[in-house]
């Protein structure tokens, strides 16, 4: 059985780095290792065919918030592929990315989407069917820490949105619901892959709140005889976003800028969208989405803009110091 590494990793798209090679560092969030391992090989082959140049792509993975902080603090990322727009905005506010980054690529620079589902043990012994089951006594929940993990922030907001919709948009009742949920959380890892390892490898918890792609990967990689996915009645549309880190690539040369831009644009190509779908992300391309229609369950999806007024407001209200997460975390 494959062990999934946790923390900061560097994956090379080539076994050797030659002086004439173009080097690219993609700083990404936690559960995209498999996606970009495949995508980097495809893009390198595409770029070689188009230009004759070799591109060597390195990867860094971790909780999205921590990764954004690393870029702010000086890690020389050429591109970022993070869990949510707020983390890219945080880098832009420090002047390392153009503030209009979100408009540079289609679909608000989110080339694929996902949502939040539950992974349970085979047979679903605790009978987890929807969000309300996560607050029952005796249910052990695994989710990452929203302070460091982008996926955890999506998890949190998905639960909050569900609670609002089932309590006439009463914010106080939604806060009580999410507080009850977090009282059942047994382990708060720093990132989504760490939480998957806690649930899958260490055998802790009854239910993992997870990215849909991570849950599908776990069942396909580790066997459907061990785990099963529960799709809730509604969840949030999760939109991971991408950007060139302007201040880094512009220090190099025009070729570095061109490669970084092409690297992200190719995510929208038919091949890029196929790779995303094969790695259990919901593709944007209509033709590719139709091909993989049966792979992704239908459910009611709400957006962060609809329910929370966008990421800036959600971050301030829920995840900033003194926000609702801090309030409900007080034991």
Question: Where are each of the predicted segments found?
Answer:
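Bacterial N-terminal signal peptides that target proteins for export
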Residues: 1-8
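N-terminal signal peptide c-region/cleavage motif recognized by signal peptidases
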Residues: 14-16
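N-terminal segment of the mature folded domain
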Residues: 20-149, 293
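Short beta-strand->loop
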Residues: 27-29, 120-122, 140-167, 184-185, ...
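Sec-exported extracytoplasmic/periplasmic mature domains
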Residues: 40-49, 72-76, 85, 92-96, ...
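Short helix-loop capping/hinge motifs at secondary-structure junctions, enriched
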Residues: 123-129, 148, 161-169, 248-258
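Ligand-binding pocket segment of bilobal, Venus flytrap-like solute-binding proteins
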Residues: 166-233
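Extracellular/periplasmic juxtamembrane helices and adjacent flexible linkers that interface
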Residues: 249-331
């Amino acid at each position: 059985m494959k062990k999934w590494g946790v923390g900061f990793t560097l994956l090379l798209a080539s076994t050797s780095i030659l002086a004439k090679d173009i080097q690219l560092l993609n700083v990404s969030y936690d559960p995209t290792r498999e996606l970009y391992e495949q995508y980097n090989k495809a893009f390198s082959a595409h770029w070689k065919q188009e230009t004759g140049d070799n591109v060597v792509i390195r990867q860094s993975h971790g909780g999205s918030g921590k990764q954004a902080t690393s870029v702010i603090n000086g890690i020389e990322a050429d591109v970022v592929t993070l869990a949510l727009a707020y983390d890219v905005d945080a880098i832009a506010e420090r002047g390392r990315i153009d503030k209009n980054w979100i408009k540079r690529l289609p679909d608000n620079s989110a080339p694929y989407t996902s949502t939040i589902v539950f992974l349970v043990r085979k047979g679903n012994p605790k009978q987890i069917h929807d969000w309300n089951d996560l607050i029952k006594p005796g249910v052990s929940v695994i989710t990452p820490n929203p302070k460091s993990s982008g996926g955890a922030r999506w998890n949190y907001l998905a639960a909050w949105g569900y609670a609002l919709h089932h309590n006439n948009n009463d914010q106080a009742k939604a806060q009580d619901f999410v507080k009850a949920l977090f009282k059942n959380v047994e382990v708060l890892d720093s990132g989504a892959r760490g939480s998957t390892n806690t649930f899958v490898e260490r055998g802790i918890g009854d239910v993992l709140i997870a990215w849909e792609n991570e849950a599908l990967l776990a069942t396909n990689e580790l066997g459907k005889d061990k785990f099963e996915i529960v799709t809730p009645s509604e969840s949030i549309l999760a939109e991971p976003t991408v950007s060139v880190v302007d201040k880094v690539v512009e220090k190099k040369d025009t070729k570095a800028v061109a490669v970084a831009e092409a690297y992200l644009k190719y995510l929208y190509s038919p091949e890029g969208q196929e790779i995303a779908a094969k790695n259990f992300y919901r593709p944007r391309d209509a033709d590719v989405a139709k091909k993989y229609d049966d792979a992704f369950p239908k459910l009611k999806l709400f957006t962060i803009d609809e329910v929370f007024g966008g990421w800036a407001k959600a971050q301030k209200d829920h995840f900033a110091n003194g926000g609702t997460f801090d309030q409900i975390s007080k034991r």
